[in-house]
Curated annotation (Swiss-Prot), chains A, B:
Gene Ontology CC annotation, any one: cytoplasm
This protein's encoding gene: hisS
Gene3D superfamilies assigned: Anticodon-binding domain, Bira Bifunctional Protein, Domain 2
Nucleotide-binding in keyword set: yes
Subunit comment: Homodimer.
Main location: cytoplasm
Catalytic activity: tRNA(His) + L-histidine + ATP = L-histidyl-tRNA(His) + AMP + diphosphate + H(+)
Protein name as catalogued: Histidine--tRNA ligase
UniProt-annotated location(s): Cytoplasm
Family per similarity comment: Belongs to the class-II aminoacyl-tRNA synthetase family.
């Protein structure tokens, strides 16, 4: 056996990293639940036919195939396998809605009646890894978690409103101070392209260029678009709208009059106006969102409102979403025809951003208090009671371990462990301390040590940790 | 595209099931952390050489291989692939300890010093899916979660003590009233076999038969052992010890005198005696554990204390563990030579047991209060404020969604949704109610409806839910 290792593009998450990941995931879950989203998990291994033809030619090349040991021997070169690893969480959602969306079960309130197995609308969140056989690189992994919240089965603009509200609440809860949810609408962009006299066939490529406006200066994007065959009049028409400035209401007002000739644009503007009204009525602080007509979002399946969150950290967007009213039909193979709208939090980027912004400063590792242990039976009892009392008070207390029988090296080992794991305090009760009814309390940050009364040691330590 | 479906032996966890799973996992995590265990996650895809030769011939056949799309074309029949899916959580733990166990990093307390990247002992928990290409059947899945807590790097009997203490605490916290942690020791069993005059080469097969004593009557097990070549004297010597009855202390006392001639047995008995003393000193209720000399545990890698938890539910053991002081060396390819002891909770069986025992009765789904919405701007504002206030009070409140513009069907849809999702209350504020400064509160369990003052509606509802 050579050196131990993992596959490129995959990661071991050791405790210090896991504690950060779990903190972010738990914060998001709490907010998802508060807004009425319910958890869903699907298998890592999907049938190939569920994934086939869903991710475009380039995407499909990145799918990992799964082969049982028995089938390895019979697999023919170039043959597709029956099973493959999950590539995203949207296709599994469409499959779940297609399979169970119309299933009826006994009504819990009245067993004689039937009710839908999945509520409609179905509001679910899903936080699971996905796999892509991409070339690994800075911030690009072959195994990474996606973290999605979607509503399937409603066209109400309240859906977009609540997804944006929960996005704002989530980033505030994670400690972000400076972030913006940029909002736009696919119908507005469609109308803009239409009214600028650009052929509808060019819509996707024009949007791809517009989407670069957050990284490139407008002149460069104009040049790129000219290279795609747009003339000066068309470019002027586009940029006149994109360059609109002011409050969200002012930008929409400007677009309303400039795009008066496009029915699609007017529909988009109408929906965004309603969204702004609802966001205000729901009390979402307008400092955290704004209409941005340069937001295009690469993926071509969006049909309505689109949004994307950017922060002060240099990591790119930390979350994005939008309405996609035709995708569930396509992805479920026509088994479910339901409108949908969702948002996705970029877990790895959020972690990188929080690291950059110093938002993990107060996160502690698992250990809080280490009670050293010497193996003397009378003393053991006292140490055990102290640990038990601390744990009952909600403190993460540990007993020091030593080899049997106890040797002086055992104490050095235990203090080394306390240091490696970042404990706040160590408590030492030896035979001497016990005879005096005392314990030695060592603050492992300042390295100062003091004597405290044994009888009230647990209370005193719990109090200091929680102050 | 044919019918939608999943691979046999895998499962979609819809919200009602997920809520139960998350409840159990969150309960276990809280207890792991309290005892100083830290989270670890490793990639689903491992290098083949990490897994090869670790699970025996039969186990290895169940491993799923992973192939990128590009490699499908060049894969030769029968050829092993470079990568495969995780089969358990113990081999990845050994790999992690082998890779990072001796790595040094800057000491957080003093950057000029170096400290170990992983604390020693390393106390980690890991809750992740594993994959096995087994034939699916009742309670046998191809993708299922394992839930392990292990301590690597200490021979202290405090490790076993705390693992059993946390096991008892976990099952109590999950609501189990009637359960037992059965405890035995591999050295005691080894000494028993030795002293009965049975060849050491027969140890594994004899233990396999003894392990069946919880399902088969002693006569059947005797018959099976006789079939394996044991004579009457050997069988009597075995069963004289196994049949010892009484308190844990009495059983150990009996074994101590019957197995006086075996050094291994006396070592095992000495360690179990210390364990009982420590469990009592730590205040673990002795109603929940006992020495059971018929417990053998199938896996042959255990070297010391072994234990297994059984409950009143008919699902088999719900958890098990033990000390395995040589396994990390073997599994890490000799990169780490550390003693270890761990426990594993059987998540699927725990869920089945809790279902059987009715321990999920009080678990609620995501929805608590649905505030119906009619789309009238003035009323909207009131509904939004009500939802916002309820959420701030920690209530899982949702706004009803309806298609725009609102039609009378919208109200029926919203009440249908409330029913499907099991909400406790629906709140209705229409123009009439608003004019009277009232809201209609419908209890969705009793289906009774009453008028409440709008101004204090949020407080009143939050109070009822929390009472």
């Amino acid at each position: 056996m050579g050196e131990l290792g993992t596959m490129g593009g995959t990661r071991d998450f050791l405790p210090d990293e896991m504690i950060r990941r779990e903190y972010v995931i738990d914060t998001l879950k709490t907010i998802f639940r508060k807004y009425g989203f319910e958890p869903l998990e699907t298998p890592a291994i999907e049938r190939w036919e569920t994934l086939a033809g869903k991710y475009g030619e380039e995407g499909e090349k990145l799918i990992y195939h799964v082969v049982s040991s028995g089938s390895l021997g019979t697999l023919k070169a170039g043959e597709r396998t029956e099973h493959a690893l999950r590539y995203d969480l949207t296709v599994p959602l469409a499959r779940v809605v297609g399979m169970y969306g119309d299933q009826m079960v006994a009504d819990p309130a009245d067993p004689k009646k039937q009710t839908r197995r999945l509520p409609r609308p179905f509001k679910r969140y899903q936080i699971q890894p996905v796999w892509r056989g991409d070339r690994p690189g800075e911030g690009r992994y072959r195994e990474f978690h996606q973290c999605d919240a979607d509503v399937v089965g409603s066209t109400s603009p309240l859906v977009e409103t609540e997804l944006i509200a929960l996005t704002v609440e989530a980033f505030k809860a994670l400690g972000f101070a400076d972030f913006t949810v940029k909002i736009n609408h696919r119908q507005l962009l469609k109308g803009l392209i239409e009214q600028a006299g650009i052929a509808p066939t060019k819509e996707a490529t024009v949007l791809t260029s517009i989407d670069k406006l957050d990284k490139l200066p407008p002149e460069k994007v104009r040049l790129e678009l000219a290279g795609k065959g747009l003339n000066a009049d068309q470019l002027d028409a586009l940029f006149q709208v994109i360059a609109l400035e002011g409050t969200s209401e002012q930008v929409l007002e400007g677009a309303r009059s400039l795009l008066a000739g496009s029915e699609a644009a007017q529909r988009g503007i109408g929906e965004l106006t309603k969204l702004l009204h609802y966001l205000e009525a729901l009390g979402v602080d307008s400092a955290y969102y704004r209409i941005d007509l340069a937001l295009a979002r690469g993926l071509d399946y969006y049909t309505g409102t689109i949004f994307e969150t950017v922060s002060a950290a240099k990591v790119g967007s930390v979350g994005a979403g939008g309405r996609y009213d035709r995708l569930i039909y396509d992805l479920s193979g026509g088994k479910a025809d339901l409108p949908a709208c969702g948002t996705s939090f970029g877990l790895d980027r959020i972690l990188a951003a929080m690291d950059q912004l110093g938002l993990f400063a107060s996160l502690r590792r698992a250990g809080e208090v280490l009670v050293l242990h010497f193996g003397d039976p009378g003393v053991s009892q006292v140490c055990f009671e102290l640990v038990r009392g601390l744990r009952e008070a909600g403190v993460r207390a540990e007993l020091g371990y030593h080899e049997e029988p106890f040797t002086p090296n055992g104490m050095r080992q235990q203090l080394g462990y306390a240091n490696e794991k970042g404990f706040a305090y160590a408590v030492i009760v030896g035979p001497d301390e016990m005879a005096q009814g005392q314990a030695a309390l060592r603050d492992l940050t300042t390295r100062r040590q003091e004597k405290i009364p044994l009888a009230t040691a647990g209370q005193l330590i719990a109090g200091r940790l929680r102050s």
